[in-house]
Amino acid sequence: MAAWSPSAGTRSSCLINNGITETWRFPSASFLTGKNKTKRGSETLVVTRKHIYRDLGSYGLSKICASKTSVELKEEHVSTRGAKVHDLKKVASYLFRTKSGALVKVKVEKKREKYSIMVYVSSLEPNGADNKSSLVMVWGVYRSDSSCFLPLDFENSDQDSQTPFLKSSLSELMLELEFDGKESPFYLSFRLKLVSANDPNGLEMLTHRDTSFCVPVGFTAGHPLPLGLSSGPDGDSWNFAFFSRNSKRVVLCLYDDSTTDKPALELDLDPYVNRTGDVWHASVDKTWGFVRYGYHCKEDVHSEDDEAESIVLDPYATVIEKFLGSLFQNSSFDWGRDVSPNTPLEKLIVYRLNVKGFTQHKSSKLPTNVAGTFSGVAEKVNHLKALGTNAVLLEPIFSFSEQKGPYFPFHFFSPTDMYGHESAVNSMKEMVKRLHSEGIEVLLEVVFTHTAESGALEGIDDSSYYYKGKDSKSYLNCNYPVVQQLILESLRYWVTEFHVDGFCFINASSLLRGVHGEQLSRPPLVEAISFDPQLARTKLIADCWDPHDMKMPKEVKFPHWKRWAELNTRYCRDVRNFVRGRGVLSDLATRVCGSGDIFTDGRGPAFSFNYVSRNSGLSLVDLVSFSGPELASELSWNCGEEGETNKSAVLQTRLKQIRNLLFIQYISVGIPVLNMGDECGVSTNGSPLLESRKPFDWNMLASGFGAQITQFISFMTSVRARRSDVFQRSKFLKPKNIVWYANDQTTPNWEDTASRFLALRIRAKEQ
């Protein structure tokens, strides 16, 4: 045996090849090779093979052409003897066609601890061959990189190392190879050659695609559906399915350690066997004990810059560990008798909160492993009930970029780990179960229009998943079929797995754009969500606020199919304008009665989610405390003095203005949405930026302001509940049942911008 030097030669390879005796450079590897030894007898050919052990370098999450699993080819058998039936465990068959029309069938059988590979060739009509021509197979195996296949130099190779076929019938040739099962998984790659005494170089035969034949050993081709990770039909294997239309190569990277960044095994998926349409797939036995997985994609099959490219996360992974998919699935959860409150839309009273900010402050008096988590929200359910809340609207909880914040997700199927001390998944389920038991629904803000700049879908198939906007930013291609499917599957998953009651779609106007960014009158995604049977009982809310912009949302005519409610931006504008003394009575009257100018299109007033402040922009107390020139878009008024003050008159005016804003909000027909912290006067010192928001300070509830405003909100929600016939309506009031008054009990001057008084009388019973 002779040792090869890793520095020898000029070309890297990760193939064990039959018949090659030249030296080649293998990066970070050592291996031995021996001269082929051939012994003939009784239709059996025994050949000693090479052994490779690959040592992984420290490449972080970079693609490396390596495998630390040993591959040792023990023996090769060429025999016409049939296999015993009781030895057969699993059989996979592959059928190929050559360019000349011959059929090549390959059967991979698991026999106890070995793999038997039988190759059958039929319909062979060699051109220019004589009667002494024979068919041989030159083959090799590889794992991590199919482009490392060594060139088969038949002229310089020892002919004894070539494996001949034997006749199994008049029209069929056959050979059999056998490998030790512990050396799997790997690919067997081979070419056929017709040789004769007159033509020692032989006639090479490839597939009809002009490529080598290739079959997986120790794993199977798998199935293209469902996308993502799923269990095989017998529960003993993992099926991997991954969409990438423009990738020429996709490598499945498997990890056997949850702490390392280096793959234990890489399988370069074959585009003929492991690809159906635009989906790459493979099935791997669970017994190997892998714990994580990812993919490496290359759009240029000839690129040599493998190590510079990152390993990407499966978009459908439901459990994430260190930016890789986990092969440990979610543990079962006892939902008990959990049932959604299924509150009618018109009866909702919504509280918007940030999971971390709600209980992160030390004043929450929660243990450190509970504060700032889903469990923390569940612990504060009594505060929500005191406000009359029957639905919480959670700011995005998907795994997101910690640098950019929750409105820039990098994944759509898992809650962020920072919201659960041990298991964010179980922590969230416990929260939902607890809130449901108290009659509180759970609504999620979701972002499906853009992603974080890294760690998301980038590197998988950018031209399919993204499009460039006019601002040169990358936006998620929502209405492209595969992206639409991803979003639908995500929504269904949150409903079925986490019992979520509804969704508020941030930057909803971008859901209306086509694959090139053009405006669509009938966007496929919005329509599909509207009529999806699994989402039929969920509440759907469109919010046109753009996290990139941070300004007040633009008004967009949203296609709704009588299913979609909307965060009513026009309501916010008109109420703020009236309270600060700039609006007209007609606008306020329209908002109080349910915004008929927006929702008389087959929906109703209950589809209007009414807010006067939100998590971006000025908080409620800042709306009456700051109004500098830079805050012109906020439509605020400082009540006579900018910022903090000790002047009693200014403070009394501010308190009155806050009560005015809340009073209008809670007597308006539609759904009131209160923002976290507004009940106790949380301030950002006049900053409208989302990142300026402070955690909820629970001590402020005991202050004079906090106690008064909390009691006022509680009173207003009880009024709404008692007179649901007036304030919680699914249909608009008829004009004849509403009587309006000015301050002198005359008909109001609707367009008088100086008027500051408006009264109304409602006949609750329809006439």
Language-model features: locations:
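Carbohydrate-binding surface patches
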Residues: 237-248, 743-767
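Beta-strand-rich binding/interaction modules
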Residues: 242, 248-266
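N-terminal chloroplast transit peptides
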Residues: 1-55, 60-67
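Short proline/glycine-enriched turn/loop motifs at strand-loop junctions of beta-rich domains
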Residues: 129-133, 243-249, 288
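Substrate-binding/active-site clefts of carbohydrate-active enzymes
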Residues: 354-534, 597
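Conserved, mostly hydrophobic/aromatic
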Residues: 137, 242, 295, 353, ...
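The feature marks proteins involved in alpha-glucan
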Residues: 47-129, 144-235, 263-266, 274-365, ...
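Conserved alpha/beta catalytic core and glycan-binding cleft of carbohydrate-active enzymes
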Residues: 317-324, 515, 521-689, 727, ...
